[in-house]
Amino acid sequence: MKILIVGGNGMIGGHAALHLRSRGHEVTIAGRNRPASGTPLGGLDFLRCDYIANDLHAAQLGAFDALVFAAGNDVRHVPPGGDEAAHWERANVEGVPRFFRAARDAGIGVAVHVGSFYPQAAPRLAEDNAYIRSRKLADEGVRALATDAFRVSSVNAPFVVGTVPGLIVPMFKAYTDYARGGFAPMPDFAPPGGVNFISAMSLSEAIEGALLRGENGKAYLVGDENLTFQDYFGAFFRDAGRPVPPVIDQEHPLLPDSAICFGRGNTLYYEPDAAETALLGYRRRDILRTVSEIVAQYS
């Protein structure tokens, strides 16, 4: 298939782009910024695109068989001093379905929306959290566009852990530096609580599965391992050759309370549906391998 990946210069979309290319697909990535030259992502075809502005012409979109959308806005994308609720409305609630509608109208036949796990794993949070509500409405708006000629599904992922050759992901570089003692005198600790994690590799496999076999209009809650945050931080520390950090009930600079929408000290665990996991064809128990890969990249 000829596949357009919006957000393909980021970690999730970039990993999916390289995975899909390795599987024999013809891949073009789209985003606001071109990937660095001399990197694997820099070697892919690139379209400059701001999906919120819906600035790709029908002729450009219509050149593709399939769309993967991995550019949903989260807390990292709110303009400084901006109105968060208004941003979520414009970027997610309005912008994402509008872009999918343009893709459908241009003749793309298959689309996968990479969304957030929160609306399915903890739907109650959408009642009071404007960000989660925006991801829920974006997901529902995208899937409502399904027709016999436009097969669309969502792959809704938890916390994603991964690495892409040639791409610096500041969060994972910071985790690695922290585990190696590079943030001293900042104390070594992990916050209480835990969540489901998935590797970028597992997610890329799920995206491919949804492209090939996804049920029209379906939202798939994907996931891999339920880990405490101590387990998660501990994996980085062990690979760096240092002891697992203790749990301290205070906000962590590298995992702030704003990033734990279900509340520090709580857990958000679940087991993905076995039949859906088999249909999408993604691997499990991949987090420790992935953390080792991350630490090796940034060490």
Where are these regions (language model features)?
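N-terminal Rossmann NAD(P)H-binding glycine-rich loop of SDR-like oxidoreductase domains
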Residues: 3-23
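N-terminal Rossmann-fold cofactor-binding loop
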Residues: 30-35, 51
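Conserved Rossmann-fold NAD(P)-dependent oxidoreductase catalytic core, especially the SDR/UDP-sugar
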Residues: 85-134, 153
